[in-house]
Amino acid sequence: MTASFSCKMIASLDTGAGVYAWTTVEGITGNILIDPEGVIARPCTAAGDPLGDTLLDKRVGNVQNPDPDPGVRTAFLKIAAVLFMEKERQGRLPDAVTRTYW
């Protein structure tokens, strides 16, 4: 089974946070907000306004108030993890990321 997603930064907020639009090969889409320090991820609108209470803090390592939809929950976790890793690797939030898993 192959899983794939791509995400692209669509906004850099005045606070330094990045807003990404993402999509999976299965057609699941959304937006994710990464804080300026690169440690907090939240689902959000395209304008960067948080949606719901879902929150991933990489310092803690688990999701608070996860989405009940397993597809959305899994995609959110994978995308947040990759963005956190790229921030650490590059020293800044990436412009775009694509990943494929087999």
Regions picked out by a protein language model, each given a short descriptive name:
Residues 5-37:
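Amphipathic, interaction-prone secondary-structure segments
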Residues 41-102:
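Acidic, low-complexity intrinsically disordered segments
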